[in-house]
């Protein structure tokens, strides 16, 4: 025989308000991942916990427009706007990938007013690892 489902908890017992607590973050790391199809900008604290992120896709760009420099610039601006409000003044920038949005995202980060301690390219380079996909024939 099936047991009846007990209704435990009501609206009074649930947590109210926003789950995000606003922390003051003086220093952080800005990760820019620029592929040919999209650009993703993630802002973390120095321990690696994500504070804010944005991508060209979440900014409303669809299809081939996601890989453009303007889309990367918009994504970087959106991700940084949130952390500037939380008091971030200094940051490191780590850029990964071969995409068109690398320089545009870096330009948007520089314009935001955050002091950059260094800019590092962390694109993974194979030491002759996997075989690349076959050449595209159009």
UniProtKB/Swiss-Prot annotation:
Gene3D superfamilies: Ribosomal protein S11 (3.30.420.80). PROSITE patterns: RIBOSOMAL_S11. Belongs to the universal ribosomal protein uS11 family. GO terms for biological process: translation. One of its GO terms (cellular component) is ribosome. InterPro entries: Ribosomal_uS11, Ribosomal_uS11_bac-type, Ribosomal_uS11_CS, Ribosomal_uS11_sf. Residues 9-23 have a biased composition (Basic residues). Part of the 30S ribosomal subunit. Its main location: plastid. It is found in: Plastid, Chloroplast. Keywords: Chloroplast, Plastid, Ribonucleoprotein, Ribosomal protein, RNA-binding, rRNA-binding. This is Small ribosomal subunit protein uS11c.
